[in-house]
Structure formats: structure tokens, C-alpha cells
Swiss-Prot record:
Name of the protein this chain belongs to: Quinolinate synthase
Location(s), subcellular: Cytoplasm
Residues at which [4Fe-4S] cluster binds: C113, C200, C297
EC number: 2.5.1.72
Cofactor detail note: Binds 1 [4Fe-4S] cluster per subunit.
Family of this protein: Belongs to the quinolinate synthase family. Type 1 subfamily.
GO biological process: one example: 'de novo' NAD biosynthetic process from L-aspartate
Length: 353
């Protein structure tokens, strides 16, 4: 597995935190959003990593809470003419790729993803051009332009199966953008993978020493880890999986206590799935005082109630997602290729970031 660039140079400025709302303001915006959803013939889809009150509102109004691909598929199958995507920008793009006829709005178009930012189109195209003999596989957490350059789009729930398939055909792989997920898949499959060196700023902060100290405090707890985490952390896990796979593991594991190494936004749905279990956040590198993300994506936190209301009310250049028609067609090819592969395996594809 080859390295691309100095990952330590990939430090992104975080957005300012949303201004906290008091209870009266929250109630006002919740009701306003409900009214606007009806007026705009819109449905709200929210990612597992958004704040609990946002996930609850999506469910209450007939929307869904899911990973980015399932959000996009739900929106595509829903009769609403407008989708309000509470997540980060590539999720809005994915929704638009699958629903070109629908209006796709976001609370803000400035909600980024470090995996997306860490895989810029021009640099990635040049990298692919320098290795023309390799099949290009990109994670769902990428821009429409990067997807359009790929042969396959993949989610974490089906990554191992897909790479095993390609390896069995003798294909050599370019994998992008997450180096930790790429390392995990390479270890599971033994495939020849040339890996882009991006990382999720949330999962990259989990560290083994702090996790082992927490395990010592709760020796009977199971450790659940997303494969975007460093491999040393993954090696400590009782269950490794995508967002939806971790929620399923939380339900099925016999342990009454769970230490969870992923964005803490997942706790809303995970606690619904196993209300009698005790959930603990896995400690991040700085253990509170100096952590950057502190186990919550700062861009996901931009999806506040006021921002959602503004997106529905105003739309326009600050909120509406557009994907060039030609680019959309190119990006749809590797996405559909993955969906067809999954259907052949009778695997339900869920669970990117």
C-alpha cells in the first residue's frame, strides 16, 4: 500500500459553531420547518451524525435517518418534489445524482467533509492518470466530480466484498479517499491497493491507549468501531462496521455496556435500537481538552433548526444543490455499478460514513 502525500498537512479550518437556541426558539423553528415542508412538498432526510433533535424531527415529519446512500435512495423513492438533506455537501450531491428531477436543498452548502476536501478533483485525476492500469474505487464520501472519475463507488458495508471480487479478477486497485478504511479492506482481502491518504477528522482522533483505559474502567463492555478509524483502534474492536452495521451490532451483542468509536450523533438511533443498554463515547486523542472534533463532525453540527428553516424558506444559491448533467451521468455509472453488484449478491447496501 503506497502513500500519496503528507497527511499531517491536511488540516482544515472548522466552521463556527451554531448559535445555541433556547427552548422557545427551538419550538418556533420546529413548527416553522413542519409548515415549510408541507408548503414546499418536501421531505427531510438526515444523516446518523446530525444532532439528535434534527434526527427526531426528520422522523417526526415522515422523513428518514440513515447513511448518505440510503438518504439519497429514500429521497428518490419518496413522492416529494423537494428533498431537504441534513448532512454534508457530498450527501446533497448524491441525492441530486439519484434524483435529478427533484429540487435538493441543504441547510448550508458550506458543510464540508474532510474526506471530500482531502481528495480534490484535479489532484486525484492526475494520480489516476499516472496509474492507468488500475481500477479506480472511491468511497461514497467524495464529490460528484471524483465519483465521475471512478470505475466503482463503494460504501463501507460492501467494500470488502467488492474488493474481493475485483481481486479475484486480477485487477489492481486505486482506493480513495480514506486511508484507514483502505488499510482495513486491504488487510481483509490481500488485494493490490494503491491508497489515497485521506482521513475522517472524527475517526482519525480515536487512539488505542485512551480506548484501553476506558475498557479497563468497563471491562464487560463491547467495543464498536467504524473502519474509518486507525487500524490499531480497529484491532481492539468486538465489532467493526458501517453506521448501520454498528447499530445492528449494538442490538445483537450480549453486552449491556457498549463503547462506541464513531461520531456521537449515532447514539440517537443506537439507543433507540437497544434502549436497555448503556452507551459510552470512545475517547478521542485529546480526551476533551485538546481534541479537535471531540467525536462530533463540526460540519454536521451546522445542520441546526434555524439553518434548516432558512434552507426551506429561501433556497437559492446558498442552499440548493446543482450537479452538471454530464457530470451526473458519469457519476451515476460507478454508483449504479455498485448497486447492481450488491443486488447480485443480494446484499442491502447501507452504511457509508
Amino acid at each position: 500500500m503506497s502513500e500519496m502525500f503528507d497527511v499531517n498537512a491536511a488540516v482544515y479550518p472548522f466552521p463556527p459553531k451554531p448559535v445555541p437556541l433556547d427552548d422557545a426558539q427551538k419550538a418556533f423553528y420546529r413548527e416553522k420547518i413542519k409548515i415549510l415542508l408541507k408548503q414546499r412538498n418536501a421531505v427531510m432526510v438526515a444523516h446518523y451524525y446530525t444532532d439528535p433533535e434534527i434526527q427526531a424531527l426528520a422522523e417526526e415529519t415522515g422523513g428518514c435517518v440513515a447513511d448518505s446512500l440510503e438518504m439519497a435512495r429514500f429521497g428518490s423513492n419518496h413522492p416529494a418534489s423537494t428533498l431537504l438533506v441534513a448532512g454534508v455537501r457530498f450527501m446533497g450531491e448524491t441525492a441530486k445524482i439519484l434524483s435529478p428531477e427533484k429540487r435538493v436543498l441543504m441547510p448550508t452548502l458550506n458543510a464540508e467533509c474532510s474526506l471530500d476536501l482531502g481528495c480534490p478533483e484535479e489532484e486525484f485525476n492526475a494520480f489516476c492518470d499516472s496509474h492507468p492500469d488500475r481500477t479506480v474505487v472511491v468511497y461514497a464520501n467524495t464529490s460528484a466530480a471524483v465519483k465521475a472519475r471512478a470505475d466503482w463507488v463503494v460504501t463501507s458495508s460492501i467494500a470488502v466484498e467488492l474488493i474481493e471480487h475485483l481481486d479475484s479478477l486480477g485487477e489492481k486497485i486505486i482506493w480513495a479517499p480514506d486511508r484507514h478504511l483502505g488499510s482495513y479492506v486491504q488487510k481483509q482481502t490481500g488485494a493490490d491497493m494503491l491508497c489515497w491518504q485521506g482521513a475522517c477528522i472524527v475517526h482519525d482522533e480515536f487512539k488505542t491507549q485512551a480506548l484501553m483505559r476506558m475498557k479497563a474502567l468497563y471491562p464487560n463492555a463491547a467495543i464498536l468501531v467504524h473502519p474509518e478509524s486507525p487500524q490499531a483502534v480497529v484491532s481492539l474492536a468486538d465489532a467493526v462496521g458501517s453506521t448501520s452495521q454498528l447499530i445492528q451490532a449494538a442490538k445483537t451483542l450480549p453486552n449491556s455496556q457498549l463503547i462506541v468509536a464513531t461520531d456521537r450523533g449515532i447514539f440517537y438511533k443506537m439507543q433507540q435500537a437497544c434502549p436497555d443498554k448503556e452507551l459510552f463515547e470512545a475517547p478521542t486523542a485529546g480526551e476533551g481538552a485538546t481534541c479537535r472534533s471531540c467525536a462530533h463532525c463540526p460540519w454536521m453540527a451546522m445542520n441546526g433548526l434555524k439553518a434548516i428553516a432558512d434552507g426551506l424558506e429561501h433556497g437559492g444559491v446558498l442552499h440548493e444543490i446543482h450537479v452538471d448533467a454530464a457530470l451526473r451521468q458519469k457519476a451515476l455509472i460507478p454508483l449504479n455499478r455498485m448497486l447492481d453488484f450488491a443486488a447480485e449478491l443480494r446484499v442491502q447496501v447501507k452504511g457509508n460514513a
